[in-house]
Design a protein with these regions (language model features):
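A short acidic, Gly/Pro-enriched loop at the edge of an enzyme's catalytic core
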Residues: 25-36
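A short glycine-rich, Lys/Arg-flanked "PGG" loop and its adjoining helix->strand segment in the class I
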Residues: 50-65
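Conserved SAM-binding strand-loop segment of SAM-dependent methyltransferases
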Residues: 12-26
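Conserved SAM-binding loop
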Residues: 5-6
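A short His-aromatic
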Residues: 44-45, 91
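Short, glycine-/aromatic-enriched active-site segment of Class I SAM-dependent methyltransferases
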Residues: 72-92, 103
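C-terminal lobe and adjacent flexible extensions of AdoMet/dcAdoMet transferase-like proteins
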Residues: 104-172
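A short beta-strand submotif of the Rossmann-like class I SAM-dependent methyltransferase core
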Residues: 38-42, 68
Length: 172
């Protein structure tokens, strides 16, 4: 994938992009280096999402931003349904609740967060029928559980005030 990305950048005559192979929880990039980070349906597969968003924060320059598309849940997905969703969406195995996902982003220190897309991932009846009983299908269709594809935008503040305190407050 890295070779292909480099080929595409060369074809487009882009000289201000860089592609690196590395561990998303320990990126091979110095702090405050990247202007933009883009990810598509990857972070939900990483067990330690706090570490990933902390690492994204570290790598982004002050004022930099990310745009991340991922799969999240609303409501508890029974394990049997999770198996079905994996067959269809492929990205559901590590999905967490949407509120938890967005909370992790806020905890990492990001600001100006915006949900740019929030689309329900629907599973066709023929796939559901292969794995679920008619009763389970009816329960799923009640809408108590939702698998969603979201795209989130957020910025690293130009000034990092996560660990700052008011002058003279004695907190430091």
């Amino acid at each position: 994938m890295i070779a292909r990305a480099r080929e595409n950048a060369e074809k487009l005559k882009l000289n201000n992009v860089e592609f690196r192979l590395g561990d998303i929880e320990d990126m091979p990039v110095t702090a405050n280096k990247a202007n933009v980070i883009v990810s598509n349906c990857v972070l939900n597969l990483v067990p330690n999402k706090h570490k990933v968003f902390s690492e994204i924060y570290r790598v982004l320059k002050p004022g930099g931003h990310f745009s991340i598309s991922d799969i999240v849940l609303e409501g508890e997905l029974p394990s049997k349904w999770k198996e079905v969703a994996e067959l269809y969406a492929g990205c559901v195995s590590g999905a967490i609740q949407k509120t938890e996902y967005l909370g992790i982003i806020e905890e990492a220190g990001f600001k100006n967060m915006a949900l740019q897309k929030d689309k329900t991932v629907s599973i066709p009846d023929e796939i559901l029928a292969s794995y679920l009983t008619p009763e389970e299908i009816a329960e799923y269709k009640k809408g108590t559980v939702r698998i969603a594809s979201i795209t989130v935008y957020a910025e690293k503040p130009a000034k990092d005030d996560r660990n700052c305190c008011e002058p003279g407050s004695g907190c430091c």
